[in-house]
Amino acid sequence: MELFEMYESLGVSREVWAYGERVLEGLKERFAAIDQTAEYNQAKVLRAMHENRVDATCFAATTGYGYDDMGREKLEKVYADTFGTEAALVRPQITCGTHALTVALSANLLPGDELLSPVGAPYDTLEEVIGIRPSKCSLMEYGVRYRQVDLLPDGSFDYDAIRAAIGEKTKLITIQRSKGYATRPSFSVEKIGELIAFCKQCKPDVICMVDNCYGEFVEPREPSDVGADMIVGSLIKNPGGGLAPIGGYICGREELVERCAYRLSAPGLGQEVGANLGILPSFYQGFFLAPTVVAGALKGAIFAAGIYERLGFPCIPNATESRHDIIQAVELGSAERMLAFCSGIQAAAPVDSYVTPVPWAMPGYDSEVVMAAGAFVQGSSIELSADGPIRPPYAIYFQGGLTWYHAKLGILMSLQKLVEAGLAEVK
């Protein structure tokens, strides 16, 4: 059976397949650069594992309190060394990225302190955490103030407004690296470093925290290499490599991470407790594989931009722009196209390929959200997935793919569903 015939057996027409092959012809140099970054990051992870003498005893399960969990402690050293920080908190007890960010914020902000976002509105789920949308136990309910500086129309930082917003009470500055459900650009490590340097110039003791979700291993450097006091993320995204079934991390200055550990467990207990319940092999192996898995996801994102930009759909970033996270936004212009796109991603999934995604009122979001995610780990966005809120400009956010070839199939299937519904025409 020829390669095309295999794709055809999965539902991709000759027309769509041939169109995809034409797009791929122009991406060889981009793909080679991605592979080079993955090779560098693979060596970086491996060096940290060597220096910390990871061995088979690190995979032993612990229960109960989890005292003296050598594997847990060594994993946190591997994360800290890889990301160039003094300390790390890497735990299955952190359930998701929003949870990790909540721990980091609530641990380092006290009543009367001020939180500043110099990059506009945060991700939807953080709105209730902060109290922008009223919620019980939000930071605002506990007396933390929040200020926000929007980006300039061209997506750059409004440095004059940021300088004016940083005051005596400004304790922590939160920088969201990825675009979230917005159509702004994601920020490069270089740009984040420039912003951090500016904020530190305005107030040297301010804490700069970066929401690093979707950004790990996309570039050779991380925000912690350019001055971030804390970086925060989820293990069911990039650093889990598709193997971690749960978990989150906080890496940064030792005193800040220590406070996070006290907030996650209890004052006086901190990092000393937290059984691993036999989950550590997936954490170690996932982190080891993460640079390669992220490379495949990046190739998929660039391919998606190439596919849809040629058909006239606005893509953020576009097919030629540099990449700073694994997310590809495509403005489809209608709810019908969003649903068709997601049905194609779902049809290409290894799990639940026979189901049809429908919008629903997802907890933490203020609009109905449609999600396609036939994943081995529920909600994993390093696995092939697509989602978006059903609201103008009807943008779909595509990410992931444990292998490049799976990402490729998913993108072709998304286009196939649009073509079959008469919502797109291959040119």
Question: Which ranges hold each PLM region?
Answer:
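Short glycine-rich or small-residue beta-strand-to-loop segments that form or flank ligand, phosphate
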Residues: 58, 62, 89-92, 326-331
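N-terminal small-domain helix-loop-helix segment of the aminotransferase-like
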Residues: 63-71, 75
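Conserved C-terminal alpha-helix-loop-beta "cap" of PLP-dependent enzymes
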Residues: 309-426
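Conserved PLP-enzyme active-site core in the AAT-like
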Residues: 3-28, 35, 45-51, 55-58, ...
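Short beta-strand/loop turn elements enriched in aromatics
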Residues: 75-83
